[in-house]
């Protein structure tokens, strides 16, 4: 019986190291490829756009004693970014069809700065277009405002020159 208890103890101790591992159990903060919708007032077309954003998990801590002030929490932030341009088709005369979009080059876990970041959680908002047309959901024909993945605009690498 002692042999069995010793074997069980060894087994628990050997697997306990995996639970206390420094390796992240969730994807770490890093640039992630996503498709966002780009639109502009005066341009009738909403265009899907391939870009990179910062996403992933950062380690955090919570105080056990509620009487102490909360600890500052880190979030996945942009570290380095570049700007690319997307040209929207069909814009009205006098409307600049070029929209500049940030693309994440590198990311880091840091305190959230409300001056340039949205520090809140995800909302129940669509990342699609405001001007999308609705169509009967039973139809097999896709809406005319949707673009097939083969027609997605790739960013034209355009440096943004400070003025």
From Swiss-Prot:
It is found in: Secreted. Glycans are attached at residues 50, 124, 139, 145, 150. Gene3D superfamilies: Cystine-knot cytokines (2.10.90.10). Residues 135-163 are annotated as: Disordered. Pfam families: Cys_knot. The keyword Disulfide bond applies. Residues 135-151 have a biased composition (Polar residues). InterPro entries: Cystine-knot_cytokine (IPR029034), Glyco_hormone_CN (IPR006208), Gonadotropin_bsu (IPR001545), Gonadotropin_bsu_CS (IPR018245). It comes from the Eukaryota. Disulfide bonds join 29-76, 43-91, 46-129, 54-107, 58-109, 112-119. Keywords: Disulfide bond, Glycoprotein, Hormone, Secreted, Signal. The keyword Signal applies. GO terms for biological process: G protein-coupled receptor signaling pathway. Heterodimer of a common alpha chain and a unique beta chain which confers biological specificity to thyrotropin, lutropin, follitropin and gonadotropin. Stimulates the ovaries to synthesize the steroids that are essential for the maintenance of pregnancy. Belongs to the glycoprotein hormones subunit beta family. This is Choriogonadotropin subunit beta. It comes from Saimiri boliviensis boliviensis. The gene is CGB.
